């Protein structure tokens, strides 16, 4: 967790120092005033082409960015630390600071330095903070992950009468205008936050100081405590109404008091960080409780839904299924994966859309080709709405509207499109085509990234602009002809007319010709301005007049372009809701066609999803592992699983899975959880048939990891996660558990696993997959009617184990741990000793005195040299000799079969 700590500038002390300190410059006084008005923020203070940082800000930035720390002047007798970053590269530095949880106030020059000089020598350029950059309020492309939402989330609390807190949550993405609210109990908060995955969380300072919330806050990326007035429920509705410019919220959304408070906190924080600007947001959409599958953070991490355990996207489930071709589509797919649906009808509508594009490959590929040309309109709109957009953002809107026309034309050929596709088509039809036509006429072919320097309006669009540009360009041609005339007049062929920001236009000659221009009669025309080491510079009254004309024409042309930009921007923002709807339509089509491509390429089938407690998967495969094996040219062994209620029982089954390590137990557990999850996001699934009754909660206890920061051992983490499952899982949950109890003594672990199985069977009564190495547990099938024993098939060959990865009814009689250890490369001496110990343990009576067993098998009886090979029997020697005498390459199939039977006959009987 990153907590926003205040970054402060020193305050002048009232007591005078021993020696008079250097007086602060007017500029530094201005800096300290602005800094004091923005506590807790790093201040980027604009000075010309740089953002300067001073005092503690400079020290923090120097370390965070790896830039040189220097000094500028003194304060209270001490050097003032200083560093700076160039304005043109500032967004790169902002990205690095934001990634470290540092919030930044950007302070710009609000006037031209010439205006300050005109007021007097001691006047300072007017400056002001124009925005506050925080992790949850970003809009720039290079500060955002194009494939992920960037959520700001607010939490409001209400004390329950029975002691149970209720929480209101509101989360927004100002880069896409998304705005969602919900309520939850404190016990549900961790799972809800894991699903939303906010980039920044704002809470009241009272909530921040509450010890009960400390474990929750620790798991969050960035937490910003705010004063209580931001979470004032009495003013919340008024603040929301002000933001949306309505008299009442009733026409936009019906929210609870807690939801209203959290939503108001969000918009208040946005207004503060955007310095009074109000990015357009969708009306708050209320998320119904229980409408999505609940998945706790541990399960999300263990199943590697969006990130692997190493924190990488590559190798996750999202990476495996993401075939989208647009950023908006990728974001929507990630949203769906984070929140699988629990309503069969909604799931069915999504599956219908995917099915259309599975069946019609031509339509699928045509739509995907169109989508590749559809830009990210929502984020372009967000930048334009807060004054950070450029000409390319306007072009994105133009191209998006044109792509919408293309998509509609192709989709119109579909016969009775399903509801999801029909909704996307309706959204694509909303934006007025007149805007695209206007933008096409106005924008040039080659567009600059920013509007500041102009050059983006097409010639012929505005006659006044064309005339002004002609005047500007003609004046520059006059300068070129003037240079030729001055060269003839002076006889100095090397004479040049140049320009810089200090002198403006000037005549430049080499030093050897300088005296000539400063002597009569040329000195009447050429006025000396500057002498350098090798050049002398002059001006003329004629050149001054031309410069004024060029400057005026250039400035006027730029102002005209900026006026045109603002007008076009206003036209776009006026239909912002329609443009955002079209962008969402693109995203819906992208997800549907992407999942269809995945289904066709990887042979997925449409699942049957209903309200039963069924769970029958035939030929199921792990979507991520299968792709990894495919890249290596290896097949994936499919397996079936049926946790559906058996005849005479209402609740689902509990499968007890035994088998050796590396046989595929964990893969089998995970693949069934992932298939259920894919089905409920509306995707086809990797199986030959799948019937899944809605899963309302998904739990997993797989893998092993400690939590040293919270003082938890690996076993403690395992027990905490198991406790959550046993306390929370209901009949409609799906639970996967892998080797419960392995982190402690054998009999302790066996006892815990035994009791957990009984509790899951009798109390939770949920559909469960339970993998274990405790073979004694398989005996529970005799007394627990819904427990089914399954095992992963293996085969031994000459002392080695061959993993067949097939799940079959039955139970394993051994774990093959020593064979797996041998495969891992343990020294032969250790393997030999392990076999010897295992033989004695298996022969020993488990009830015998422990001391006697330890005496028989001392823990540290490690041989000082390699263990001797066991003596070989005469029969074994004869078998080896017979095998060595065979030459398979020279034998016919019949001869090989006869030889095999002959060898078998030599084996000892019994």
Swiss-Prot record:
Binding residues for ATP: 659-666
Molecular function, one GO term: mismatched DNA binding
Entry-linked Pfam families: MutS_I (PF01624), MutS_II (PF05188), MutS_III (PF05192), MutS_IV (PF05190), MutS_V (PF00488)
Keywords: ATP-binding, DNA damage, DNA repair, DNA-binding, Nucleotide-binding
Family annotation (CDD domains): ABC_MutS1 (cd03284)
InterPro entries xrefs: DNA_mismatch_repair_MutS (IPR005748), DNA_mismatch_repair_MutS-lik_N (IPR007695), DNA_mismatch_repair_MutS/MSH (IPR017261), DNA_mismatch_repair_MutS_C (IPR000432), DNA_mismatch_repair_MutS_clamp (IPR007861), DNA_mismatch_repair_MutS_core (IPR007696), DNA_mismatch_repair_MutS_N (IPR016151), DNA_mismatch_repair_MutS_sf (IPR036187)
HAMAP family listed in its UniProt record: MutS
Name recorded for this polypeptide: DNA mismatch repair protein MutS
